[in-house]
């Protein structure tokens, strides 16, 4: 079994971790030259701001909707990614970075001790506790299916951020 952990709205969430006053506020992060939107908090997504949208199209909306805007801070994002990796590595036998905000976790053999779904929820809780970041986790027999299951965590909130494609969940 494999899990794919993906931090939710990673760049925007990193900005919020160190600014508690931004909780539940719309946040966007701009590209290197501040030319376009590269990250959005859920609140900013709800306002209709699109990924890749040019800054000049959002500038006026920033004032009207009280959107908090940040230039990208890659040192912060790298540091937070390393923190998440450290948490996952402390609880998992093998972790493989997939991108700055996604990691594959090798869960082979874990089902002999604990259900993969329960373990996924434990990982989510620990990452949230130690870093302040939330993540979705897809769990499946292959990495490709784990990636698909992770996508499903964003579509099906009733699974509380963990979708496990296991035999036990086949009819769920």
Residue map of PLM features:
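Nucleic-acid-contacting surfaces of polymerase cores and analogous helical-repeat interfaces
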Residues: 1-172
């Amino acid at each position: 079994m494999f899990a794919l952990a993906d931090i939710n709205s990673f760049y925007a969430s990193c900005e919020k971790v160190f600014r508690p006053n931004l909780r539940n506020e719309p946040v966007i992060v701009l590209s290197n030259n501040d030319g376009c939107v590269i990250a959005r908090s859920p609140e900013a997504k709800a306002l209709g701001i699109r990924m890749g949208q040019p800054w000049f199209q959002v500038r006026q909306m920033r004032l009207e909707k009280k959107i908090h805007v940040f230039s990208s801070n890659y040192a912060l994002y790298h540091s937070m990614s390393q923190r998440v990796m450290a948490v996952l590595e402390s609880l998992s036998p093998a972790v493989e970075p997939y991108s700055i905000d996604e990691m594959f976790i090798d869960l082979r053999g874990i089902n002999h001790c604990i259900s993969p779904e329960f373990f996924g929820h434990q990982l989510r809780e620990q990452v949230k506790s130690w870093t302040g970041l939330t993540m979705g986790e897809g769990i499946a027999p292959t990495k490709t299916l784990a990636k698909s299951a992770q996508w499903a965590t964003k579509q099906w909130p009733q699974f509380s951020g963990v979708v496990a494609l296991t035999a036990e969940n086949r009819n769920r």
